[in-house]
Swiss-Prot record:
Protein's organism: Idiomarina loihiensis (strain ATCC BAA-735 / DSM 15497 / L2-TR)
Annotated binding of ATP, by residue: G42, A43, S44, G45, S46, G47, K48, S49
Transmembrane segments: none
Membrane topology, as annotated: Peripheral membrane protein
Any one GO molecular function term: ATP binding
Protein name per UniProt: Lipoprotein-releasing system ATP-binding protein LolD
Length: 228
């Protein structure tokens, strides 16, 4: 038994490229504790996003095991994985993936409605989070009417609306300038402290990564703890 919230054991991922087998990840062992913030860094194409997709149940490993609170998830079917993601995970990407025809409030409320909450209850929860991330004056604005930093704040609010245990963030500041990127990182740090949500943050920005509790380096398909 382990007290890890999310962990993997000897996780590997390979692809067929014509007649060749390309190995992206090799025997990854990783554990995330409740409330922990971990950065995963590495060169472009090193497999960082692939690792995040495997940990989030968005892709299947070629071999190895994935556990959530000591329950093995590797054999789960797609519908069970989808339900688990909706109840326990939040996702933030480099591109915000907001639905353009919906307002900020409607975008943030959507995961709540998918989880079965009434529209009224979902919008109340969404409004509280949008106020928390500093967008109380942007509730009715659509994504095209928001700045890049504001759109990413909406995406973060959406990731938190179902009170996830873990947020997986893939280059969450990749499309932002330095000042906006720093403000997004500070927001994630604050939410971690306030809500106890664990984070795995994939990033190429070493300066920002160093603000987190632990840095793991992915190189040649192998995950290494950064030596301080």
């Amino acid at each position: 038994m382990t007290d890890a919230l999310l962990r993997c054991k000897e996780l590997s991922k390979s692809y067929q490229d014509g007649g060749d087998q390309v190995t992206v990840l090799k025997d990854i062992d990783f554990a995330l504790q409740a409330g922990e913030m971990v950065a995963v860094v590495g060169a472009s194409g090193s497999g960082k996003s692939t690792l995040l997709h495997l940990l989030g149940g968005l892709d299947k490993p070629s071999s190895g095991q994935l556990f959530y609170k000591d329950q093995e998830m590797t054999p789960w079917k797609a519908d069970k994985l989808a339900q688990w993601r909706n109840q326990n995970l939040g996702f933030v990407y480099q591109f915000h993936h907001l639905l353009p025809e919906f307002s900020a409030l409607e975008n943030v409320a959507m995961p709540q409605m998918i989880a079965g909450k009434s529209p009224t209850e979902a919008k109340q929860q969404a409004e509280q989070l949008l106020v928390r991330v500093g967008l109380e004056h942007r509730l009715s604005h659509r994504p095209a009417q928001l700045s890049g930093g504001e759109r990413q704040r909406v995406a973060i609010a959406r990731a938190f609306v179902n009170k996830p245990q873990v947020v997986l963030a893939d280059e969450p500041t990749g499309n932002l300038d330095g000042e906006a990127a720093e403000s997004i990182y500070q927001l994630m740090l604050e939410l971690n402290q306030e809500m106890g949500t664990a984070f795995i943050v994939v990033t190429h920005d070493l300066q920002l990564a160093e603000q987190l509790q632990r840095v793991e380096v992915l190189k040649n398909g192998i995950l290494h703890k950064e030596q301080g």
